[in-house]
Amino acid sequence: MAKRPKIQITLIERKGPVGCHRGHKVGDTYDFDTERGKLCPMACHVAFPYIDILRYGGSVPGQPEGTAVFCCPDVETINVFKIEKIED
């Protein structure tokens, strides 16, 4: 059985006027498999479909191969995250 690729999630931008209630800052990076508990649950909820698409061989239309960009659903914060598939 093939090994699953790693998934890295990085906060790349904040568009809202209010800081993140979870304390995330631009530049924070997380290994999804080992650090997902550190991620905001709302952001994780939005990230799950993209993670599954990338991890299992799919691609997200309009995004570079192996990546996806999404926003957290907090309208006052609007953190923008980048998901990257990392092949070992």
Label every PLM stretch briefly:
Residues T34-C40:
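Short, charged beta-turn/beta-strand-edge "cap" motif at the junction between a beta-strand
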